[in-house]
Amino acid sequence: MEIDINGDPGTGNHFDDVHIRQVGNYSPNAKQAIFNTIHQDKAESRLACWFRKLNDEFEKDNKLKKKFDDIRRYKTKLPHTIGLDQKLKDGGFSEKAIEQARRLKQYFAKKSTKFQYYESAQRIDSYLFAKVCSSFDTYVMPLIEQATPLTDIKRAVYEQVILPIMNELNENGAADACLCYNEDDIFGMLYYLTGNCHINWTDYDV
């Protein structure tokens, strides 16, 4: 059995141009050779692994007695918290938009509470909380500090925070039969973090 390597990255090719094939019936006297292409399976992501484990934990009702510190810090209100309604009002949200945000926050909190003592659910929520906060601080907060119109800020929230997270969930959540988060849930997560003072919609340093 021999390995046949085609391509040479040193002659202008990319490493993607190099193909490794297993010769199935190599013989000096053979008139033809049968090649079997070797495929390397993509490693499972942490997120996909947690979704898969959550199904098993839920089926076996394998719960923890307490929450991890990583998730508790996001679910704990920070000092001097002024609440979701006031945060959004300060950010220029209408009463109708605030009511919708409050509703989405409650829907998310209800779903999250159902799975709050499953280890993998805590890890998933903690991971997503961190993604929401990081993306918001990176792409949205600078717009808020520049007094960008609210319509543009909301567009940035959707394009830079909600959509990337949904894409990651769609790519890694095929095994998810428990949380099944959708866009409303991620918005609810955003407003949940707002209510706990991890997200601001105006620059309070001004």
Question: Language-model features: where?
Answer:
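Long, low-complexity intrinsically disordered regions enriched in small/polar
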Residues: 1-45
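Long, low-complexity, intrinsically disordered terminal regions
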Residues: 46-206
